[in-house]
Amino acid sequence: MNKANLFIISAPSGAGKTSLVRALVKALAEIKISISHTTRPKRPGDQEGVDYFFIDETRFQAMVKEGAFLEHATIYERHYGTEKDWVLRQLKAGRDVLLEIDWQGARQIRELFPPALSIFILPPSIEALRERLIKRRQDDTAIIEQRLALAREEMAHYKEFDYLVVNDNFDQAVQNLIHIISAERLQRDVQEKKLSRLLAELVEKQ
């Protein structure tokens, strides 16, 4: 069985994480993105089972008690959680898994899976982040300022991550993510299992 990788991508609200992740998954083969469960309401364009699994507070808390989540966190008074069984099944089958979660969840995952590789997406500036939140047209000015304050708190945890990617130029940011994941897949301990037959043939004495 091939060794599977667990990747984490986190970012403050408005940094473009979701768009980057979608482009990354489209560009890279053999990587599965975990779909989180959430109690937040659907937004226009959200698809059940594609963007999130939308559940109510009662069901979410029941899943917490059942130990169904690998990690869970509260963001803007809404709950988000990563289903444990699905992730473990993918890893056991040798498939790379990508988690799109916040820094709280990333911390929990690293405690459970120390080899997990984590990437934090940064905006090019606070003003750029503010402009992106305004262009969403989802919140009023007061809420946007609250989100910016929380974003500063989130970005203060950047040192907990392995890589930092600034989303200034979208295409370049996608390429940076591809390079990071490709390099991780080429590490010796990963390649050693994938290339076991070739390596045996190359080094075996005749």
Swiss-Prot record:
Guanylate kinase-like domain: residues covered: 4-182
Principal location listed in the UniProt entry: cytoplasm
GO MF terms held by the record: ATP binding; guanylate kinase activity
Recorded superkingdom: Bacteria
The keyword Transmembrane helix belongs to this UniProt entry's keyword annotation: no
Keywords assigned: ATP-binding, Cytoplasm, Kinase, Nucleotide-binding, Transferase
Primary role: Essential for recycling GMP and indirectly, cGMP.
Family the UniProt entry places it in: Belongs to the guanylate kinase family.
Broad class of enzyme this protein falls into: transferase
HAMAP family documented for this protein: Guanylate_kinase
Protein name, UniProt field: Guanylate kinase
InterPro entries: GK/Ca_channel_bsu, Guanylate_kin-like_dom, Guanylate_kinase, Guanylate_kinase_CS, P-loop_NTPase
Gene name linked to the record: gmk
Reactions mediated catalytically: GMP + ATP = GDP + ADP
PROSITE patterns: GUANYLATE_KINASE_1 (PS00856), GUANYLATE_KINASE_2 (PS50052)
SUPFAM superfamilies: P-loop containing nucleoside triphosphate hydrolases
Annotated organism of origin: Coxiella burnetii (strain RSA 493 / Nine Mile phase I)
Binding site for ATP: 11-18
Pfam families linked to this entry: Guanylate_kin
